[in-house]
Amino acid sequence: MATSSVSKGCFVFKPNFKKRKISVPIEDYFNKGKNESEDSKLRFETYHLMWEQMKCETERLQEELNKNLFDSLIEFLQKSHTGFKKNSGDWGHQIKHREIPVAALVLGVNVTDHDLIFRSLTEALQNNVTPYVVSLQAKDCPDMKHFLQKLISQLMACCVDAKPKEKESIQVTQKMTHCSMDPLSSWYMTVTQKTHPKISGKKRTTSSKWQSPPVVLILKDMESFTTKILQDFIIISSQHLHEFPLILIFGIATSPIIIHRLLPHAVSSLLCIELFQSLPCKEHLTTVLDKLLLTAQFPFKISEKVLQILTNIFLYHDFSIQNFVKGLQLSLLEHFYSQPLSVLCCSLPEAKRRINFLSAHQCENIRRLPSFRRYVEKQVSEKQVALLTNERFLKEETQSLLENLHVYHTNYFLVLRCLHNFTSSLPKYPLGRQIRELYCTCLEKNIWDSEEYASALQLLRMLARDDLMTILQKCFKVFKSSSEKQLGSTAKRIEEFLAQFQSLDADAKEEEDASGSQPKGLQKTDLYHLQKSLLEMKELRRTSKKQTRFEVLREKVVNFIDCLVREYLLPPETQPLHEVVYFSAAHTLREHLNAAPRIALHTALNDPYFYIKNEALKSEEGCIPNIAPDICIAYKLHLECSRLINLVDWSEAFATVVTAAEKMESNSATTEEMNEIIHARFIRAVSELELLGFIKPTKQKTDHVARLTWGGC
């Protein structure tokens, strides 16, 4: 940069002002290129609001499911070290207080959910037991030194009531103190004596009752810790237990037997272990499905194939509730992104209000829906013309159809729960043991056309009186909570059935018992008379078979349930406008959640436009776009090579492709500088391909690399 001054000196040249990058609002991503939708912002806001409601409901469910487990843990921790400050000369008392209290927390193999559980557990312990709660992972503790360093650093960070000067001294001692239990014990005694009179706040409400609050150490992944670290720490801690009240919580993913496999008897005898078991993952899944999908509270629903994908990933991959909820969130996002009419996927009063403001283009979208077309075809000719030409009449009819869809879902889930109560206890579970299995079957087809449903009805016709009454009482509670007019009489009908069962007199019971008992006349006879009597009895039963009062009433109950199923458990595809609330793009969801890594990697490198929606990246098959990412260019070039790739030839080909785009951008840089930049870009692209496993160095030739993959992917 030049200056017109003739004197010598230093001149300051301010850099050019760089424009601040304007961040694109998230709702703008709902616009598909040129086809900009006028309600994209409203759809995004609706999605965000619904997801926040579903997220809050999920968190509340997790708290309720973990409440019993946390309460048991807190009770165990509060009972531990109760006599910490009691000086007793009793030998048994001294031996007992040399044992470290251990809570073996078996959480299952859903490791991805453990962090959330431990986070909630830490908060619960700090609110109810002690402020000194430390969590350690095996990856942060390769040896005893790092183990104690992490323990001391986190423990000293728990001292929240210290003054600024005390905090500085704590940080200094944290750096200078030798990592051992002696200074840690003395620090604990000093801190508890200082902070005990001043303890206040939510986190110390319960711990203030303790003369010396315990230190809780959570080992999140106990199986991953080395045996030597665990043994040394337990032995050392047991010697300082009289001055450093330690409680251990072992996070176990497999089985409690792992404790005895990792620790010898001499070490495990220093522990006072109590086992705690979390709820099975399948119960968590059933509860989440029950509160998020099997309810009319949230209008968003998913199809049978989408639900099958989410449950299969859960059951056959990770057992993770968090991943299941993320898959549900992705389904919700894809639905609001791909379906323009998802703007009506909200509460019924709000949906009716939004229908009044629909544009002409949105009305055409309603007319294009396959379910609405089938509905129009069933109407009379005059109504068909009005629906296809009159927007006002269309909006009124849409409001009515959405209201019918809401009533359909309310009745659907009530009858579904009733049917599940009847079939969940049948032998061999013909319709599934879990309600999600029954729900998938009902979403897929007419359930009454299946063989499993027919076999379930046969088994229901053989239920005993007590079992049938128990099931009817459960169904009565389900329908009693309903306020719908159509199902209001159902609860009364079930109540009548229960009254009739209770009014069965003793004669009916005796008649039922007599029908299954053998006559008393066949006590002693020969073979001929026995055969003759059996034939007569068989003929008598065939000609004069009469049902008891109980059998007649049981048949009425089964027929009544069958009528409910045929009337209310219709597949969602039969309902007009079901596309507004149902997400059915199972293929899209499978690509995102259960994609094959190798195929996805090949697609990204071979066709970057597939993931980066940039029109400049479009190219014909076999061609290399000039402005593609460097790794894509290097990958396409390496596909044309044989088993050994010459790095020089590969670099020259890479430079040839890249310079075709560079020359059009700027000509200010010199040729040497451009070559150095291109060479550095090539080295980085080759290193990335090596990291991904496409190539590797070879000792056959120094300037060559070996290709590791063949074929299209």
Curated annotation (Swiss-Prot):
Keywords: DNA replication, DNA-binding, Nucleus, Phosphoprotein. GO terms for cellular component: DNA replication preinitiation complex; nuclear origin of replication recognition complex; nuclear pre-replicative complex. The keyword Membrane does not apply. It comes from the Eukaryota. GO terms for biological process: DNA replication initiation. Component of the origin recognition complex (ORC) that binds origins of replication. DNA-binding is ATP-dependent. The specific DNA sequences that define origins of replication have not been identified yet. ORC is required to assemble the pre-replication complex necessary to initiate DNA replication. Binds histone H3 and H4 trimethylation marks H3K9me3, H3K27me3 and H4K20me3. Pfam families: ORC3_ins, ORC3_N, ORC_WH_C. The gene is ORC3. This is Origin recognition complex subunit 3. GO terms for molecular function: DNA replication origin binding. Signal peptide: none annotated. Its main location: nucleus. PANTHER family: ORIGIN RECOGNITION COMPLEX SUBUNIT 3 (PTHR12748:SF0). Component of ORC, a complex composed of at least 6 subunits: ORC1, ORC2, ORC3, ORC4, ORC5 and ORC6. ORC is regulated in a cell-cycle dependent manner. It is sequentially assembled at the exit from anaphase of mitosis and disassembled as cells enter S phase. Belongs to the ORC3 family. The modification Phosphoserine is found at S23, S517. The keyword Nucleus applies.
